[in-house]
UniProtKB/Swiss-Prot annotation:
This is FMN-dependent NADH:quinone oxidoreductase 4. It catalyses: 2 a quinone + NADH + H(+) = 2 a 1,4-benzosemiquinone + NAD(+); N,N-dimethyl-1,4-phenylenediamine + anthranilate + 2 NAD(+) = 2-(4-dimethylaminophenyl)diazenylbenzoate + 2 NADH + 2 H(+). The keyword Repressor does not apply. The gene is azoR4. It comes from Burkholderia lata (strain ATCC 17760 / DSM 23089 / LMG 22485 / NCIMB 9086 / R18194 / 383). Homodimer.
């Protein structure tokens, strides 16, 4: 049984293509005999605090944190415990204005913590989150894979790698806003990528 943490960050609710892809992926795992323990974090509903100077320093261990900062530390610890307790991380990361949703960035700002999920050395940071693989489901209105306009892929690889998560796969649903056939073609291509992951 795999312990799966799902992060949904689309602002489109039930119309979200990344959430639909994740739900389909999980349903197919179940159909294939996997009895997974799944935790779903809807980051839009969670309304995570945005990193500012107060929270930044509190999460790095500053003395005498305010009540607000203490709540953020407790939340950060909870999110990190969920992450470290997982075997597989599924991330819904639609592209908004060439980048990840703010809600997803807020989650990473709470879990990427020095001395907790990574540590500094004399050369490079070393990740402290071990034994977890990740699959990112990313929908886009245009076609961006392999282009300078794709800031989503390098950012997610880098921030996951910072914490030690280096086994990362991507499922892209691209060109969804391109007429007349982009939507159907983009989802069909994502479907093929998902099939390859199940193989």
């Amino acid at each position: 049984m795999a312990r799966i943490l799902v992060l949904k960050s689309s602002i489109n609710g039930s119309q979200s293509q990344t959430s639909t892809l994740i739900d389909t992926f999980l349903a197919e795992r179940q159909a294939n005999g996997h009895a997974d323990d799944v935790i779903v974090r809807n980051l839009v509903d969670a309304d995570l605090p945005m990193l500012d100077s107060e929270l930044f320093h509190a999460l790095r261990g500053a003395a005498n944190p305010s009540e607000r900062a203490q709540r953020a530390i407790v939340l950060s610890d909870e999110l990190i415990a969920e992450l470290k307790g997982s075997d597989l991380l599924l991330i819904g990361a639609p592209m908004y204005n060439l980048n990840v949703p703010t809600q997803l960035k807020n989650w990473f700002d709470l879990v990427a913590r020095a001395r907790v999920t990574f540590r500094y050395t004399e050369t490079y940071p070393v990740g402290l989150v071990e034994g977890i693989s990740a699959i990112v489901f990313s929908s886009r209105g245009g076609v961006h894979v392999g282009q300078d306009t794709d800031a989503v892929t390098p950012y997610l690889r880098a921030v996951l790698g910072l914490m030690g998560i280096v086994d990362v796969e991507f499922v892209y649903a691209e060109g969804l806003d391109m007429k007349p056939h982009g939507f159907d073609a983009g989802l069909a291509d994502a479907r093929r990528q998902m099939d390859a992951l199940h193989a």
